[in-house]
């Protein structure tokens, strides 16, 4: 009977109008309760994550339960992955970095289990270099791996809810009573309940975990996703409300909330990432800031704009605007890059929806909207701002001030040109204002309060005063040209060239490179200081809360200079494309090219500094104990190896095949003159030699060293494995061959090209004296081991390959950089020079006899100066002839080997 009842009750809810037959007796009370329980569970909002994540209040109850009972990382990871999927390609690529640092990085507070293949790829490739498709695939695989944990958490919540042990059950029951009423009212009430639950969770933050850092990370992650759903978060707006994520249009949002469709999303776990424990910060204090000659004092600060500009919305900066936006879409739109070929018409207002829900918004929402539109009280002392203030519902000022007839007569390209010029001016003013905020609210107070030594503070904010001066002067020139031209700028090329070309451009490139290259170091230093010094942490939070910061954090302001440099080429390119006059167009295009060169130089400086920081981290973890204990004389000079003094060319994981039965996973560093094979052991990086035999020989000839000099290195593809390659080199007359295996064929090609290029760029100085003739390679050392002995993965080696390897080992001693230039041509020039010295009166095309008394033999003595010059030329000629003799000897030994390689074992005649 019970089985039958279960079968009858198993389908979903019965259709209206049909009354099921009751077949349960009075004695089956427990079974009846079970049926009611199953029915309640079927109607629950917590059957799957897809259902609950559309209900902010229900999701908050689930999140609180999971945060207090489980590890919340998997659930938060899935939610933030869903948020990533709602972004456009460009925004998603940037947001993936925050997702990586929050959930995938090894030091992340909320790190989740990562599939091995994804973890391997992330270890070998920087997150910012991964393509969009691969990023999407990684996120999908990570989310898929979290489904079991999330399903277990949902199951636990459902079972606890049936027993009345889940939080906020009464509030959820009251909310569910509103289902079926007016949709707008229900959604407003749902958001209100979610806000209350979120506020309560923030108040009980300290109970989530004993680790305060983790508790803050969990609360910030939850708050970020709630803002994504349209729930207002007071603490999030003040501390972590950033605009790293930016949605073009909320696909499933309500059409009657226009403000929510443009709402920016924050960087994942801003406060958590800011306070998260990181590896030891490299000591940069020895990198003293360069001291330059004092330049004239900064001009009057003009043009600080009180309106939000697109420049502040690029990259990290951003704002939440819960109220109705009054500005045209084109100035604040996150969907368009500045300087695009077809900028939006600024006169077009953004679509506005009905205002039926305006009364449901909290009272402070209007104030927040007004804060972003009007000048702030903290911005006084910046004259010239009013010239750029725009009316909230009107297009830029140049349209108003240009006569209507002139405006209507302008061609479309000219209108676009004026729009981009106006955008250049407005965003430049916003950038100047941001730099002044950095100086006035952070740099200067830090110096006065002695939070950092002055030298270290100058490394955190290098050349900040000079940058303010340069950008302010550029803004003043743009403002002046705008006023002189009556707000319709015809010629701007000379102003642009004066800023980006010549000496001024070089100075701008120097100070911007200095500032941008230190930004990673600055962020690390500030994080470390905030983590250790509560007084400094309070100072930063107080400064960030000021109106002038516009809810931006310090870590969001530091990268603004780099972001600004990326916009100049785009803006200037757009101006040039819409300029018809050839001379003016040429000037603008030249200025755009100068901007690209400056950006390229700055990017290179940033990469070099990042490489230096990475080398410092590797140096800190480098374990040289094996080298110091080794008796190998070849390794004696590397016992105190300092890789920070070298240049990092490339790095990545490879497999080192020592023998056919032994392979070692190594992290390879290609430096400017060395190739290092590092073995990871916990956090340490070992430089360890390996023997090709079970018992190393006393002379060390069977040892493969982890340090390879590149002066004589060359690469060769392994014929039987397209992912593998050989690195062959000679070291003090000893030739060795290493077999390394990459993950893909393209990686193998890249490694071979970089090693060959780096080795080819090294120059060996010519010997000061004639070296001794090289003995035959076979007479001084054992033959170079074949590919199978050095590790061929158990593959069979053909006789032809073995023969090739043997001949190749004999050829290795000859693989060294040749002398610069051609020796024969040099010797001939020396002979002609001596001829001119001995016979100065003889013309190049003449063959007559020399005159008496001109210093020729038999005609009189030579002058002392000429005698000295002739002697030097003779010595140089003698050295050149010795080098030619050495080359001839080497060639004679090389010809038989080349004959064998070509299949002819008979040596060619002509060498004795």
Curated annotation (Swiss-Prot):
Residues 416-605 form the DH domain. The modification Phosphothreonine is found at residue 695. Residues 777-789 have a biased composition (Low complexity). It is found in: Cytoplasm; Membrane. The modification Phosphotyrosine is found at residue 738. Changing residue 165 to V: In a colorectal cancer sample; somatic mutation. GO terms for cellular component: cytoplasm; cytosol; plasma membrane. Residues 647-760 form the PH domain. Residues 283-313 have a biased composition (Basic and acidic residues). Keywords: Coiled coil, Cytoplasm, GTPase activation, Guanine-nucleotide releasing factor, Membrane, Phosphoprotein. Residues 248-413, 763-802, 841-865 are annotated as: Disordered. Ubiquitously expressed. The keyword rRNA-binding does not apply. The modification Phosphoserine is found at residues 374, 409, 863. Residues 41-232 form the RGSL domain. It comes from the Eukaryota. The RGSL domain, also known as rgRGS domain, is necessary but not sufficient for GAP activity. It is linked to Immunodeficiency 62: An autosomal recessive, primary immunologic disorder characterized by recurrent severe respiratory tract infections and bronchiectasis, due to antibody deficiency. Affected individuals have an abnormal B cell immunophenotype, with low levels of circulating memory B cells. This is Rho guanine nucleotide exchange factor 1. The lineage of its organism: Eukaryota, Metazoa, Chordata, Craniata, Vertebrata.
């Amino acid at each position: 009977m019970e089985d039958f009842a279960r079968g009858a009750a198993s389908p979903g809810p019965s259709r209206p109008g049909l009354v099921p037959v009751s077949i349960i007796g009075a004695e089956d009370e427990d079974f009846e309760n079970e049926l009611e329980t199953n029915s309640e569970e079927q109607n629950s909002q917590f059957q799957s994550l897809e259902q609950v994540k559309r209900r902010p209040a229900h999701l908050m109850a689930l999140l609180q339960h999971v945060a207090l009972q489980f590890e919340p990382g998997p659930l938060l990871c899935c939610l933030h992955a869903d948020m990533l999927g709602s972004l456009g390609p460009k925004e998603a690529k940037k947001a993936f970095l925050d997702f990586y640092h929050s959930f995938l990085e090894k030091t992340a507070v909320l790190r989740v289990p990562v599939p091995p293949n994804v973890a391997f790829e992330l270890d070998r490739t920087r997150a910012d270099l991964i393509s969009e498709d691969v990023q999407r695939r990684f996120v999908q695989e990570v989310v898929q791996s979290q489904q079991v944990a999330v399903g277990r958490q949902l199951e636990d919540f459902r079972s606890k809810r049936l027993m009345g042990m889940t939080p906020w059950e009464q509030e959820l029951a009251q909310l569910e009573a509103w289902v079926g009423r007016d949709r707008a009212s229900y959604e407003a009430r749902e958001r209100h309940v979610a806000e209350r639950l979120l506020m309560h969770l923030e108040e009980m933050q300290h109970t989530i975990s004993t680790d305060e850092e983790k508790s803050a990370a969990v609360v910030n992650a939850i708050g970020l996703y709630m803002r994504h759903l349209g729930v207002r978060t007071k603490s999030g707006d003040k501390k972590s409300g950033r605009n790293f994520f930016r949605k073009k249009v909320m696909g499933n949002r309500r059409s009657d909330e226009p403000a929510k469709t443009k709402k920016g999303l924050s960087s994942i776990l801003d406060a958590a990432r800011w306070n998260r424990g990181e590896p030891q910060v490299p000591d940069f204090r020895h990198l003293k800031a360069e001291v330059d000659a004092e330049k004239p004092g900064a001009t009057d600060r003009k043009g600080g704009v009180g309106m939000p500009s697109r420049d502040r919305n690029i990259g990290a900066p951003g704002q939440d605007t819960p109220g109705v936006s009054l500005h045209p879409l084109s100035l604040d739109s996150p969907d368009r890059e500045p300087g695009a070929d077809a900028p939006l018409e600024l006169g077009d207002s953004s679509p506005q929806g009905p205002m039926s829900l305006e009364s449901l918004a909290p009272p402070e929402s209007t104030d927040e909207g007004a804060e972003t539109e009007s000048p702030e009280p903290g911005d006084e002392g910046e004259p010239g701002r009013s010239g750029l203030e725009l009316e909230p519902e009107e297009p830029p000022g140049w349209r108003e001030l240009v006569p209507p007839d002139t405006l209507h007569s302008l061609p479309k390209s000219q209108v676009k040109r004026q729009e981009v010029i106006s955008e250049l001016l407005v965003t430049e003013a916003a950038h100047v204002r941001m730099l002044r905020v950095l100086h006035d609210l952070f740099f200067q107070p830090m110096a006065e309060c002695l939070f950092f030594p002055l030298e270290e503070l100058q490394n955190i904010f290098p050349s900040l005063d000079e940058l303010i001066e340069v950008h302010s002067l550029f803004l003043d020139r743009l403002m002046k040209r705008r006023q002189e031209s009556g707000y319709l700028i015809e010629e701007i090329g000379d102003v642009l060239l004066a800023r980006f070309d010549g000496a001024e451009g070089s100075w701008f490139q120097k100070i911007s490179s200095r500032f941008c290259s230190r930004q990673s170091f600055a962020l690390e230093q500030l994080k470390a200081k905030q983590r250790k010094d509560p007084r400094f942490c309070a100072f930063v939070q107080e400064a960030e809360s000021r109106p002038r910061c516009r809810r931006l954090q310090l870590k969001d302001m530091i990268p603004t200079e780099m972001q600004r440099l990326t916009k100049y080429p785009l803006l200037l390119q757009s101006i040039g494309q819409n300029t018809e006059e050839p001379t003016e167009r040429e000037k603008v295009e030249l200025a755009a090219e100068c901007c690209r060169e400056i950006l390229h130089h700055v990017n290179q400086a940033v990469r070099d500094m990042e490489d230096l920081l990475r080398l410092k981290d590797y140096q800190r973890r480098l374990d040289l104990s094996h080298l110091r204990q080794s008796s190998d004389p070849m390794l004696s000079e590397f016992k105190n190896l300092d890789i920070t003094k070298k240049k990092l060319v490339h790095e990545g994981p490879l497999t080192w095949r020592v023998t056919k039965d032994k392979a070692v996973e190594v992290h390879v560093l290609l430096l400017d003159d060395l190739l290092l094979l590092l073995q990871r052991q916990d956090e340490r990086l070992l430089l360890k030699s390996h023997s090709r035999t079970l018992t190393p020989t006393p002379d060390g000839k069977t040892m493969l060293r982890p340090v390879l000099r590149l002066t004589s290195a060359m690469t060769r593809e392994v014929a039987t494995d397209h992912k593998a390659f050989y690195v062959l080199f000679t070291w003090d007359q000893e030739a060795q061959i290493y077999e390394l295996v990459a993950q893909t064929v393209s990686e193998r090609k890249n490694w071979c090209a970089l090693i060959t290029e780096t080795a080819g760029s090294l120059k060996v100085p010519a010997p000061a004296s004639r070296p001794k003739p090289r003995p035959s390679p076979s007479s001084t050392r054992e033959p170079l081991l074949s590919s199978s002995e050095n590790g061929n993965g158990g593959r069979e080696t053909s006789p032809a390959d073995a023969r090739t390897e043997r001949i190749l080992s004999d050829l290795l001693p000859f693989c060294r950089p040749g002398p610069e230039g051609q020796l024969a041509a040099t010797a001939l020039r020396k002979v002609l020079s001596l001829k001119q010295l001995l016979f100065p009166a003889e013309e190049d095309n003449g063959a007559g006899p020399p005159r008496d008394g001109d210093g020729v033999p038999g005609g009189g003595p030579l002058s002392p100066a000429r005698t000295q010059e002739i002697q030097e030329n003779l010595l140089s000629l003698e050295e050149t002839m010795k080098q030619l003799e050495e080359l001839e000897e080497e060639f004679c030994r090389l010809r038989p080997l080349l004959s064998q390689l070509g299949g002819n074992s008979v040596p060619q005649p002509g060498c004795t």
